[in-house]
Amino acid sequence: MPYLLLFALLFALNAPLARAASCPQWSPQQAKAEVAQLRATLARWDEHYHRQGIALVADELYDQSRERLNHLQQCFAVGTSPSPLASARGPVPHPVPHTGVDKLADRQAVARWMAGKSGVWVQPKVDGVAVSLTYQQGRLVQLTSRGDGVNGHDWSRHIPQLDAVTRQLPEALDLHLQGELYLRLSDHVQAKAGSANARGTVAGLLARKQLTGAQGNAIGLFVWGWPHGPEQQAERLAQLARLGFPDSQLYSIAIDTLEDAAHWREHWYRSALPFATDGVILRQSSRPPAERWQAKAPYWIAAWKYPYAQALAEVRDVRFRVGRTGRVTPVLHLLPVTLDDRRITQVSLGSLARWHTLDIRPGDQVAISLAGLTIPRLEQVVHRTVERQAVAAPAPDRYHAHSCWQASEGCDEQFIARLTWLGGKQGLALPRTGPGTWRRLVEAGLVTSMTDWLQLDAERLQQAPGISRLTAAHLLGSFDEARSRPFDQWLRALGVPIGKHLPLTGDWQALASRSAGHWQTVPGIGAKRSRQLVEFFAASEVQAIAAQLAETGIEGFRPPPQRIEQ
């Protein structure tokens, strides 16, 4: 027992340290400012959504921003925010409060929630707007927005236009239902189309004073709650179907295991449905009497949401990658996030101009998606950090097509990119000459120009860290192969600006003497490309490389032999 107590005490003492490790390293002043700014942003989003029906940000980005605020408030003990539903509160009380729903983060959380529970059902989590519906003598007479779960706004003015909603029951019953008004879609596949802004569209329509017939007909209803209905879910669903709500039964499945829940979650995520969804709802068949329901998450219902289509990621650093042609590509290095089971740690911005426009700094929060389900893509800047860190960006004219032909300060990226192209399949196609090899040779000072490597021997190659005797032998074999490559392959390896299918006939002297007009006589070469070719052959750095290759004896670069007069 003493050992168990000691272990428990050590765990308790270390738990806050583990949590603190994921907290930002901010001063108290910055923490207060960052939290205040995030609270203000969320309050503005809430106000627009609940009062005007306007979603200023995607639902999943809102959810992640709310989670981030909760995390920061715990990190820095700066109090809690008002309920996000505070601005949604209206003057009309619900007959029975709308409960909240706990969100289960992963399979392990779902397994814990299901443990010990029986009679569990799974339904799609329809992505719409929650409402209460009141029927008197079988006629729909009251439609109330969820509001804060206790009081909402009266939307009854829209009832005449909601043709897709059951407005008259087959029996003259008085009953109260809870459900989701959703945007009616045709064969909507959530995994492919995402949320399609369905929730925001419906919220915007219902915030209007009046709907047209077409607008009303675009709204459907999914009933998920009958507070005073039969005790067991199967009977509730059967009676709802008889009353004119068949979808509730069609999209409700009794399950026994975690695997069942995972199966239906995946099935509905990738199947065509008449509405957008953002996960599944798990609920027990039996629940407490409606008189005990409260506007908070109960134990008998939970949500298992789908993977985010957009992840909110924090920028750790902004770096600038320089390519072979001098193109500068800003790259955001991120705190790792997961999208569709892929770990994302960086995203390209494409161009220096785009980075200047967006002005992204370390600490900013950005939205990331996957283009084509594989390539990380920046969607937008969601939150900007209060304290703007300086970023050392290269001057727009620092790098270009003829910069960095040699190793020098600030040139490693472009120079190594040139060498990588030279040895790659689009160049000389030299085995075992990837970017890592060239970087080792450059950093060891063994290669400082585009032709130094032709003069290296095994002893000098082994001076570079990571290059063994065997590797050196392989590299020497590759370098020897380069000497026999044809002239046009050497030119393409050096990056001559011409398409790979266009011919390069003649030797160095013949091509270097061509004018722009001469180049334009070649089919497929226009005015712009001809100017680039003239600039390439006239560049002093390229001419120096050609001279070095001529001295080395590479075909096509050697001047023709002088004729001796008799």
Curated annotation (Swiss-Prot):
Lineage: Bacteria, Pseudomonadati, Pseudomonadota, Gammaproteobacteria, Pseudomonadales
Entries under InterPro entries matching the protein: DNA_ligase, DNA_ligase_B, DNA_ligase_CS, DNAligase_adenylation, DNAligase_N, NA-bd_OB-fold, NAD_dep_DNA_ligaseB, NAD_DNA_ligase_OB
Protein species of origin: Pseudomonas putida (strain ATCC 700007 / DSM 6899 / JCM 31910 / BCRC 17059 / LMG 24140 / F1)
Name of the molecule in the record: DNA ligase B
Known catalytic reactions: NAD(+) + (deoxyribonucleotide)n-3'-hydroxyl + 5'-phospho-(deoxyribonucleotide)m = (deoxyribonucleotide)n+m + AMP + beta-nicotinamide D-nucleotide
Keywords (A to Z) from UniProt: DNA damage, DNA repair, DNA replication, Ligase, NAD
PANTHER family: DNA LIGASE (PTHR47810), DNA LIGASE B (PTHR47810:SF1)
HAMAP family, per database record: DNA_ligase_B
Gene: ligB
GO molecular function, one term: DNA ligase (NAD+) activity
